[in-house]
Amino acid sequence: MGFITKAIPLALAAASVINGAEILETRAGVQTLADKYIVVMNDGMSDKDFDSHRSWVNRTHRRRLIRRGAKAMGGMKYTYNFPTGLKGYSGHFDEQMIKEISKRADVKYIERDARVQINAIEQQDNVPSWGLARVGSREPGGTTYYYDSTAGEGTTAYIIDTGTDIQHEEFDGGRATWGENFVDDMDMDCNGHGTHVSGTVGGRTFGVAKKSNIVAVKVLDCNGSGSNSGVIMGMQWATEDAQSKGADKAVVNMSLGGAFSQTSNDAAKAIAEGGVFLAVAAGNDNVDAAEASPASEPSICTVAASTEQDGKADFSNFGQVVDVYAPGDGITSAKPGGGSQVLSGTSMASPHVAGLAAYLIGLGKGGGPQLCDTIKQMAIDVIQNPGSSTTSKLINNGSGM
């Protein structure tokens, strides 16, 4: 399936508290990374105090390695400092070090880092697609995509994924650029998922916003595998870059997720609070999306997958956190090296919404997280059997056809 990671049904388990800071625990079945943690600081912490805390962590970690003969651990790896205030870090620490960190009054909570990965369910080369036609039509079964010629011009879409083949003909030799890589040393999409997603957002043939610019933010490797800590670093980078260029002209797509993670949700909320629109795949386990992250974060736009017959895709998650449905079953888009492939999943639905957001920005319909409300208002009430407590709204670009 196109959605990155299998979202294991999970509510946040009871948290343990050691002299103050919560160490959030996950239920059996979640693939946590041994001795790797994400530490989130208290709200409102100053940069000076944050620097002081991290200096203390580095000093204490080195002391443990040298004086106490603790087993070798890498220590701090990523530092998070979102423009909207979320501060924290991730790293490789032994249990005793984590206990010492948890005793600090300036720590809000600690969460075990966990793995994310791709699981493909369908792939077929060079067949017709239907998703674009459905976005531009009020009736199913169309074969033409109707859209305004502005087509998202002047907007930027950040694709947090496996990377993008920026040389693909779909991106007109320049609209796609490389942003950052937080998973390996290969600035390429050696998996294919991210290129497909990028094509749906802004490809000249397959894209909803055909003139938008694409920025690749790689957080998953060739096997479609990565970590929450690396994904969050990609989220921070995209937010900062978008704000430096104009948050109201930017959208972010995350066709990825996993079991409930408070840190992932907090990072997604920070993107929205930074004034950037964020579309996220609801997940592919046919369960309530409230069990998945970052899909369960209410301030973002969570997208479920529909079929060509305007039904709920049988794999799609559902529930009150779903904002809209978008085409996600048998979607044709770009593949690395040229040409196209067909994939299914809420991963394919989400970029239709990110592309629609870029399209609406190009039309002068505003920008930022409030665009999700605009998209919901424009959507048409057609999804059959959408799932318990789930919207039946399918996205539409308002072309009137």
Swiss-Prot record:
It comes from Trichophyton tonsurans (Scalp ringworm fungus). Residues 1-20 form the signal peptide. The lineage of its organism: Eukaryota, Fungi, Dikarya, Ascomycota, Pezizomycotina. PROSITE patterns: SUBTILASE, SUBTILASE_HIS, SUBTILASE_SER. Its main location: secreted. It is found in: Secreted. One of its GO terms (molecular function) is serine-type endopeptidase activity. Residues 21-119 form a propeptide. One of its GO terms (cellular component) is extracellular region. Belongs to the peptidase S8 family. GO terms for biological process: proteolysis. Residues 36-118 form the Inhibitor I9 domain. It is an enzyme of class 3 (hydrolase). This is Subtilisin-like protease 7. Secreted subtilisin-like serine protease with keratinolytic activity that contributes to pathogenicity. Residues 129-401 form the Peptidase S8 domain.
